[in-house]
A protein has these predicted regions:
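Bacterial N-terminal signal peptides that target proteins for export
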Residues: 1-8
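Formylglycine-dependent sulfatase
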Residues: 2, 20-170
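Bacterial N-terminal signal peptides
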Residues: 8-18
Length: 170
């Protein structure tokens, strides 16, 4: 009887050890937040004395808080392109913002550009995008063709459209 208890205890310890090892091997969750027209000091986590952002403050406390910022552009579309690709927008064919905020047919983030979500997906991550896309209205320029598996987004600025897209359907 003692042998069975000792064996069961030993197996339980082995199982516990393998579960701990599995937890250590898991990749971290990565959440990237991008907001148009948000300055460095606009969140309480970064020192704003009056604006309270408790949820973002908690994310900053429990995650990695970045304190050196570089933007690929000063306006939304090329800045998003720079964030997603790591390339200067001019190298992707964008040197300024979207004229009149409406893209021409076929205009957007090139499907040939390698994106961060494509790299994460290849490394076994699940990818998602929620919010404003404004990097191309039609296939192959939509988020699903740029590496995102799950999406819920506006294709343009909300002053141009109220259509919400979920996983490539209105």
């Amino acid at each position: 009887m003692k042998t069975h208890k000792a064996l069961a205890y030993f197996l339980l310890l082995q199982l516990h050890g393998s579960l701990l090892a599995e937890q250590k091997e898991r990749s971290p969750n990565i959440v990237i937040l991008m907001a148009d027209d948000l300055g460095y000091n606009d969140l309480s986590a970064y020192g704003h004395p009056k604006i309270k952002t408790p949820v973002l403050d908690q994310l900053a406390r429990e995650g990695v808080k970045l304190t050196s910022f570089y933007a690929g552009a000063t306006v939304c579309t090329p800045s998003r392109m720079a964030l997603l690709t790591g390339a200067y927008p001019a190298r992707l064919g964008w040197s300024k913002g979207v004229i009149g905020h409406i893209m021409k047919k076929g205009q957007g983030l090139s499907p040939d550009a390698l994106t961060m979500p494509e790299i994460f997906k290849a490394a076994g991550y699940r990818t998602a995008m929620f919010g404003k896309w404004h990097l191309g209205d039609e296939p192959p320029l939509r988020p699903h063709q740029q590496g995102f598996e799950t999406t819920f987004y506006l294709n343009k600025s909300n002053n141009q459209t109220k259509e919400l897209w979920r996983d490539d359907e209105v």
